[in-house]
């Protein structure tokens, strides 16, 4: 019992799987059968087209020259011949339409002409075809037929005729099948079509309809062969687009005017309409005067140029960083050392000043702590031995100055103010730029002035640029860039030759000391000698 129940459950469980597999199998078989049936139909259609084309080719292979000439006339390859043929056909048509002959007589005459041509064709038109009927699409046949490459050969024409005939037969079979399946609908549609033709024949004569059909047959090959419709559309497209845009603009203007009148009608008091019209015209004239005409191309070009330009702040930052900046271009990196070695031009004062400030800052922020611990007694023979080198360096440095008034910033790190009313600049160590350097520079180039580090306190109020004295060992923090600019403009004072000599006399210095370039700190034993001389000057200046 249990085993039987288990077998029953197994059969019940396998039922849905079996049904699904059967359904899938049936669907696949139906799909495959439909695909095979479509393939068979296509193969049968192609075979039927081939048979019919071969039959037509066998009948028309003797008329290849006539068919080629007819194609040339229909496509107007020779306009004069085509024009004469069209005039002859029109005259023949109107002659037959105006005659009292019956249509059956015309039909019989047409059939008689056909049979006579078929009978006399071998005598007047010899057979020039040499290919077999199994190969109606060979190239040798088209060449022998006399047809041009852009015209249809007889095999191609036969194939097109066969396809058209089979398509007509298929539509006719579908129509008959529709008649058998839906007789009522078929009757209604046929009756409506006949009624339309009756109305058309009542208003338009039959002879005119026939003439329109004849003209269509004569002119349609010309239109298709030369693509007249496409050429006409290509030439008329700009005019149509312009007309469309103008109509849209006029419609938008009318719509805007209508909405404006509605708003004015709602807001205006219940008075006459004439003042409203005058106000509207005046407002429109004013608005037209305040609305300029914007050229789209010029606006886009202006925006593109504005976006590519750099602001003044960006240009100054890039120039100070060693970049060659030009408007509406990308910055190009240049060699900073070459810019520093070249002579500064008068047209670039800001660049020269910023470079000098940077050099002064580097020299003043590095106090020679290792030199301060060394012995202070140094010989002056080393200074005498290097006088010639220092003179050459001083002359080269003074020649590189951009203007007669070359300022050196001296307000970064101060070492205390000396007594006797003499205020020293809060610069670094005094040996960086000593008064001997200033006096030597003045003797070397009288037209060039460099301010000394210590200024005579002639002003009653202390200058805000003077910082409180700090110890020599502790470095002074750097001020902000804004404070640097303000202090740079306020710390300098021009002194004449008499004040400089008085200052040298108070410090007890000799004016014959060789000059030292202001923008480069002294090297070697000169530093120790200058330190010793500065200490002696401070000892003499103390009370």
Curated annotation (Swiss-Prot):
Any GO molecular function: endoplasmic reticulum-autophagosome adaptor activity
Subcellular location per the Swiss-Prot or TrEMBL entry: Endoplasmic reticulum membrane
Listed Acidic residues bias regions: 275-285
Membrane-protein topology: Multi-pass membrane protein
Ranges for region Disordered: 254-287, 336-394, 411-486, 504-543
Residue positions where Phosphothreonine is found in the record: 279, 334
GO CC term (a single one): endoplasmic reticulum membrane
A Pfam family this chain is assigned to: RHD_RETREG1-3
GO BP term, pick one: endoplasmic reticulum organization
Motif LIR motif in this chain: 490-495
Residues modified as Phosphoserine: 281, 283, 291, 311, 337, 344, 347, 385
Keywords, comma-separated and alphabetical: Autophagy, Endoplasmic reticulum, Membrane, Phosphoprotein, Transmembrane, Transmembrane helix
InterPro entries: ER_autophagy_membrane_reg (IPR052114), RETR2_RHD (IPR055257)
Subunit structure: Interacts with ATG8 family modifier proteins MAP1LC3A, MAP1LC3B, MAP1LC3C, GABARAP, GABARAPL1 and GABARAPL2. Shows higher affinity for GABARAPL1 than for MAP1LC3B. Interacts with CANX.
PANTHER family on file: ADP-RIBOSYLATION-LIKE FACTOR 6-INTERACTING PROTEIN, RETICULOPHAGY REGULATOR 2
Its job: Endoplasmic reticulum (ER)-anchored autophagy regulator which exists in an inactive state under basal conditions but is activated following cellular stress. When activated, induces ER fragmentation and mediates ER delivery into lysosomes through sequestration into autophagosomes via interaction with ATG8 family proteins. Required for collagen quality control in a LIR motif-independent manner.
Entry's family note: Belongs to the RETREG family.
Annotated protein name in UniProt: Reticulophagy regulator 2
Natural source organism: Homo sapiens
């Amino acid at each position: 019992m249990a085993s039987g129940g288990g077998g029953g459950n197994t059969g019940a469980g396998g039922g849905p799987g079996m049904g699904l597999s059967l359904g899938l199998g049936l669907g696949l078989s139906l799909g495959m059968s439909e695909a095979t049936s479509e393939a068979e139909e296509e193969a049968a259609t192609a075979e039927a087209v081939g048979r019919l084309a071969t039959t037509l080719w066998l009948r028309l292979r003797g008329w290849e020259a006539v068919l080629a000439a007819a194609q040339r006339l229909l496509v107007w390859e020779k306009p004069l011949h085509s024009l004469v043929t069209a005039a002859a056909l029109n005259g023949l048509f109107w002659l037959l339409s105006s005659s009292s002959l019956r249509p059956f007589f015309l039909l019989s005459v047409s059939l008689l002409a056909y049979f006579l041509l078929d009978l006399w064709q071998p005598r007047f038109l010899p057979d020039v075809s040499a290919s077999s009927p199994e190969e109606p699409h060979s190239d040798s046949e088209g060449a022998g037929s006399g047809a041009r490459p852009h015209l249809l050969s007889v095999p191609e024409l036969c194939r097109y005729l066969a396809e058209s005939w089979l398509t007509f037969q298929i539509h006719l079979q579908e129509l008959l099948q529709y008649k058998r399946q839906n007789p009522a609908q078929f009757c209604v549609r046929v009756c409506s079509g006949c009624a339309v033709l009756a109305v058309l024949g009542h208003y338009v004569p039959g002879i005119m309809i026939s003439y329109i059909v004849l003209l269509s047959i004569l002119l349609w090959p010309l239109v298709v062969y030369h693509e007249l419709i496409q050429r006409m559309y290509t030439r008329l497209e700009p005019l149509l687009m312009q007309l469309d845009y103008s109509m849209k603009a006029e419609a938008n203007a009318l719509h805007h005017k209508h909405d404006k009148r509605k708003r004015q009608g709602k807001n205006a008091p219940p008075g006459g309409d004439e003042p409203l019209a005058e106000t509207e015209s005046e407002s429109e004239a004013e608005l037209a005067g305040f609305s300029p005409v914007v050229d789209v191309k010029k606006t886009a070009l202006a925006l593109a140029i504005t976006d590519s330009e750099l602001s003044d702040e960006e240009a100054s930052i890039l120039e100070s960083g060693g970049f060659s900046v030009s408007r509406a271009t990308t910055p190009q990196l240049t060699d900073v050392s070459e810019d520093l070695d070249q002579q500064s031009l008068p047209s670039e004062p800001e660049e020269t000043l910023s470079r000098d400030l940077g050099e002064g800052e580097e020299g003043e922020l590095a106090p020679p702590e290792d030199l301060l611990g060394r012995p202070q007694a140094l010989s002056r023979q080393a200074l005498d031995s290097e006088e010639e080198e220092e003179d050459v360096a001083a002359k080269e440095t003074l020649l590189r100055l951009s203007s007669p008034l070359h300022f050196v910033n001296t307000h970064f790190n101060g070492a205390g103010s000396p007594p006797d009313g003499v205020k020293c600049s809060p610069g670094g160590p005094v040996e960086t730029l000593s008064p001997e350097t200033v006096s030597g520079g003045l003797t070397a180039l009288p037209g060039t002035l460099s301010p000394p580090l210590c200024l005579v306190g002639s002003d009653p109020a202390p200058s805000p640029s003077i910082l409180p004295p700090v110890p020599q060992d502790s470095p002074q923090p750097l001020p902000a860039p804004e404070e640097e600019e303000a202090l740079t403009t306020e710390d300098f004072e021009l002194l004449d030759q008499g004040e400089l000599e008085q200052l040298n006399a108070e410090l007890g210095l000799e004016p014959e000391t060789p000059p030292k370039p202001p923008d480069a700190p002294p090297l070697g034993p000169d530093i120790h000698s200058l330190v010793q001389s500065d200490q002696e000057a401070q000892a003499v200046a103390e009370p």
